[in-house]
Amino acid sequence: MLIIEVSEIRGKCPVYKKGDKIVIDGPEIVLEKTDAIRIHALAPLLHYVVALRDGVDPRKLGLSKEEDVAYIQCVDPGEPYTEGGTVIFKCYIGE
């Protein structure tokens, strides 16, 4: 399974808090194990989910300096442009 965990929030996010997770098993989001889903977060995540789920090294995708974790951020720029904030997601294979 691919685990997408909120690692950091820069500003304010009305949906996520640090430690929240989205869990993906194959082609499905496992709703019972997922804390929240925000439309702003789906756009950047969906570009990489299949590759990461299938074991592509995040370094080759330019998403990390480490081989077993990727970092992707939400598209909300936060202050002073919006009242929200940027969420940094840590993506890794887990159970």
Whereabouts are the PLM-identified features?
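Short, structured beta-strand/loop micro-motifs enriched in basic residues and often containing a Trp
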Residues: M1-E8
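Acidic, aromatic-enriched beta-alpha/helix-loop junctions
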Residues: G26-G62
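Short, compact, well-ordered microdomains
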Residues: K60-E95
